[in-house]
A protein has these predicted regions:
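An extended, acidic, His-containing surface patch that forms the Zn2+-binding/catalytic region
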Residues: 181-182, 238-316, 324-337, 345, ...
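Acidic/His- and Gly-rich active-site-bordering loop/insert found
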Residues: 2-111, 132-139, 321
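Short pre-catalytic strand/loop immediately N-terminal to key active-site residues, enriched for Gly-Thr
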Residues: 104-115, 383-387
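Acidic/histidine-rich catalytic neighborhood of metal-dependent amide-processing enzymes
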Residues: 108, 114-190
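Flexible glycine/proline-rich, aromatic-decorated loop/lid segments
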Residues: 186-202, 410-417
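A common structural junction motif
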Residues: 84, 230-234, 339-348
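Acidic, glycine-rich active-site loops and adjacent beta-strand->loop/helix elements
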Residues: 83-85, 144-153, 175-179, 203-206, ...
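A short core secondary-structure module
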Residues: 212-235
Length: 476
């Protein structure tokens, strides 16, 4: 099938699509803050309805709404998205207002532009363009759009338990992906798991004058000492028993890793760093990036950190950490190992609070959805994609794809590029990438539809009264 009409439609409506993205990006929807979440959910639902998707907005009690949408007919494929965004951070680090939606030099700057409103709007635009140029979708797309990705998706996990029928599908399209520093599209067929925690140390009933520092325990030092036992100076996780639970990489994944290379020089330049952890490079760096577990201190808070001098002995100290999990680690296992590890070293007083967790998810490159995505990438970008057997990031993939047995295969791609800086200041997407992602999904839909037609034809040829006789086969 020729996609020239489809591509022309996308190009003619490029400005309109960009303006729709601007509109959503100008609406703050920081899940951790809670302001504007209902309005954002309603705006997303209206955006879905605008392109002909039938919707239903589910209220989730004290959580944020989940929008379900469906369009097309045929075999079902889940399309995941989220409308919440990460906290802005320091405004002084931004070149433009984080919710300005400023377009400068072909890039749209806003918190959520890359993660993940750009992906969501590209999906919706692809549905519109396909229906306008080809008619009804040859497959059924089931959109699941949540507002708690940044909080660990607690409502989504409950939603999957309450509505498992909505998640029964032949495949899942996820909202993560980018073009690397060499402009190659990166496709992921799974995601690391995650557990996000808070460690707390407690001291006096309130902050004290630091003159008491010689005789009153300091929870800040206490926490630092506990943290120092979790990893080695070289960044290796040293929790007792942790490494014994790491599964060896299987032959299929080992083969997939051989085809992946990181643009080490380009990434170091982009990140402005001098080198990699433990001076890794080449295949070892790729392997660690994709299959290495992590323990990251995401932030720390204690005492006085505002402007001006204030000599205090803190009453509390807090650190937030995330663990990215690889086979065979689970959130519950890591939490238990960490608790035991700290207790054995005399840190029973350190409090562990689980803020959010999600299991890992992983699919085969031979799945129908993976093949459709990989083939479409070649067609749109004109180059072979990098296919990650597991993305280094995380999400509620296990909740969405783990409803059925065996798990629903997933493939992920997105609108970002190496300089999008999601979660950081000046988050942005290149509008050219945004438009290419629309064209990308259009072709994925078509390939999945063609696979469906081939399957139906095969069934007709081999079943019941539509079976083709031996003589007919010879005649053909």
């Amino acid at each position: 099938m020729s996609f020239s009409r489809f591509d022309r439609y996308v190009d003619r409506h490029a400005r309109s699509f960009a303006e729709r993205l601007q509109t959503l990006c100008r609406m703050p929807s920081v899940a951790a803050r809670g302001t504007g979440m209902r309005a954002m959910a309603e705006a997303v639902e209206q955006s879905m309805q605008r392109v002909g998707i039938g919707t239903r907005l589910f209220k989730m009690g004290t959580g944020y709404p989940i929008i379900y949408g469906e369009c097309g007919s045929g075999p079902s494929y889940v399309v995941y998205g989220h409308y919440d965004v990460q906290p802005v951070g320091h405004l002084t680090d931004w070149s433009f207002g984080p919710f300005s939606g400023s377009i400068v030099d072909g890039k749209l700057y806003a918190r959520g532009a890359a993660n993940s409103k750009g992906d969501l709007l590209a999906r919706l635009a692809a549905v519109e363009a396909y229906q306008k140029t080809f008619g009804k979708l040859p497959i059924s797309l089931r959109f699941i759009v949540e507002g708690e990705d940044g909080l660990g998706s607690p409502s989504l996990f409950r939603f999957t338990d309450e509505h498992p029928d909505l998640f029964t599908a032949q495949g899942c399209i996820w909202d993560e992906g980018y073009r690397d520093t060499k402009e190659r599209p990166v496709i992921s067929l799974g995601f690391k798991g995650i557990t996000f925690i808070e460690l707390r140390a407690h001291g006096a009933r309130s902050d004290l004058h630091s003159k008491w520092g010689a005789i009153v325990p300091n929870p800040a030092w206490r926490l630092v000492q506990a943290l120092a036992t979790i990893t080695s100076p070289k960044g290796v996780i040293t929790i007792d028993g942790f490494s014994s639970h790491l599964a060896p990489i299987d032959a299929q994944d080992a083969e997939a890793l051989k085809a992946i290379e990181l643009d080490e020089a380009g990434l170091k330049k982009e990140f402005r760093i001098g080198g990699w952890v433990r001076s890794m490079k080449g295949p070892a760096l790729v392997k660690e990036h994709i299959f290495g577990p992590t323990c990251t201190i995401c932030g720390m808070q204690t005492g006085h950190t505002e402007a001006g001098a204030k000599t205090v002995l803190p009453s509390t100290a807090m650190a937030r950490l995330d663990f990215r999990l690889v086979p065979d680690l689970t959130p519950a296992l890591v939490l238990n190992l960490l608790r035991t590890h700290l207790d054995l070293r005399g840190f029973k007083d350190i409090e562990i609070i689980e803020l959010g967790s999600a299991p890992l998810a992983k699919a085969s490159a031979t799945s129908q959805v993976a093949q459709a995505v990989i083939g479409s990438a070649m067609e749109v970008y004109g180059t072979a994609p990098l296919v990650y057997p597991m993305d280094p990031s995380s999400g509620p993939v296990g909740a969405v794809c783990g409803v059925s047995a065996p798990p629903t295969p997933v493939a992920s791609f997105g609108v970002s590029y190496a300089g999008s800086n999601p979660h950081g200041p000046d988050e942005n997407v290149r509008l050219d990438d945004f438009l290419l992602s629309i064209k990308f999904l259009g072709r994925v839909i078509n390939r999945l539809g063609e696979d469906n037609e081939e399957t139906k034809t095969d069934k007709l040829r081999t079943s019941g009264r539509y079976a083709i006789s031996k003589e007919e086969k010879i005649a053909r």
